[in-house]
Amino acid sequence: MQPIRYRTDLTPYNTFGLHAQARAFIALKHADELRDIVRLPEFDRDTVLWLGGGSNILLMQDYDGLVVHMENKGIREIARSDGMVLIEAQAGEIWHDFVLHTVALGLSGLENLSLIPGTVGASPVQNIGAYGVEAKDVIHSVRCFDLDTETFVTLSNADCRFAYRESLFKQEGKGRYVIVSVVFALKTHFVPNLGYGDLAAKVAELSAGREATAKDVSDAVSAIRNSKLPDPKVLGNVGSFFKNPVVSAEKAATLLQRHPDMPRYPQPDGSVKLAAGWLIDQCRLKGFQIGGAAVHDKQALVLVNKNNASANDVRQLAQHIKFTVFARFQVELHAEPNWLPTSFSL
């Protein structure tokens, strides 16, 4: 087990680059270390922060508790049959590196999720998604450490109760399950999913007349994301700041009467998903800035740390966007990242 560090600067551990310190900090290198970590005097189940890539958190103040940084690594094939491969990745693996690894192995299923920041362990929590694919579509099972019983358990896809940007790990299982690895069910035969946005055109450009591959899709997604989204290493951000709101069919119809060009995505249950970035853009908020926090000038869905932003700058900017969008469309936006502590949530 790694030594505990005290008063640790968390700026390098959150992609928005907010300044905060942890009262205590420890790096986890192997899942088995959890049995020892939960017995540390600094460990408090109610306050411990399990930290991955820090790409989905907003540190609003110093963290008065133990931070466990998940650094366990490893990828292995578990089984292969009937055109399907089960492959397990440890929670500390960098997500995009893992996606590229599976593509290089000739496996299909994760290519649409290329370049999403964060670690493998975060993928089930948020049920990450992009370009028509969600993590739930490819997750077979999730291996966790159950803090109730202090044993390792395996949860099936159904056990995880996935929904849009939701899962068991954000609801009833929050504070109980520590994700240590994820098993993905991937295909050996490439079946492209190109029905979202301008992905098909970019893939056609890259494949140049030949039959497209999973690598073409991964490269296309990466190129599109790089053209629209800032690199958090250069300009701090947490990716998409707001969830795409889901409204009733009646509400969507009313909005369409006033905004016939409004992007909308009908859902299986009859509701309609709207594009949060389009709503924000219609309010002419690109480039809008409060203190050091700003709406990105190319992608309205992304808030950036433009100039040493404070936590209060970020909160005020997010509030302004929520109020402005609601005033114009009567649609409520909800933030994707987790506010820490949660009392700061909008």
Curated annotation (Swiss-Prot):
> Could you tell me the keywords of this UniProt record?
Cell cycle, Cell division, Cell shape, Cell wall biogenesis/degradation, Cytoplasm, FAD, Flavoprotein, NADP, Oxidoreductase, Peptidoglycan synthesis
The Gene Ontology CC terms held by the record are: cytosol
Q: In which pathway does it act?
A: Cell wall biogenesis; peptidoglycan biosynthesis
Q: Where is the FAD-binding PCMH-type domain?
A: 18-189
For this chain, one GO molecular function annotation is:
UDP-N-acetylmuramate dehydrogenase activity
**InterPro entries named in the record:** FAD-bd_PCMH, FAD-bd_PCMH-like_sf, FAD-bd_PCMH_sub1, FAD-bd_PCMH_sub2, MurB, MurB_C, MurB_C_sf, Oxid_FAD_bind_N
According to its UniProt record, which residues of this chain constitute the active site? 165, 240, 336
Enumerate the subcellular locations listed in this protein's record, separating them with semicolons: Cytoplasm
User: Per UniProt, what is one Pfam family of this protein?
Assistant: FAD_binding_4
- List the disulfide bonds in this chain: none
Q: What does the entry give for GO biological process?
A: cell division; cell wall organization; peptidoglycan biosynthetic process; regulation of cell shape
> SUPFAM superfamilies annotated for this entry?
FAD-binding/transporter-associated domain-like, Uridine diphospho-N-Acetylenolpyruvylglucosamine reductase, MurB, C-terminal domain
List the EC numbers from the record.
1.3.1.98
Query: Family per UniProt?
Result: Belongs to the MurB family.
| Job description of the protein | Cell wall formation.
Which HAMAP family does this UniProt record tie to the protein? MurB
Annotated protein name in UniProt: UDP-N-acetylenolpyruvoylglucosamine reductase
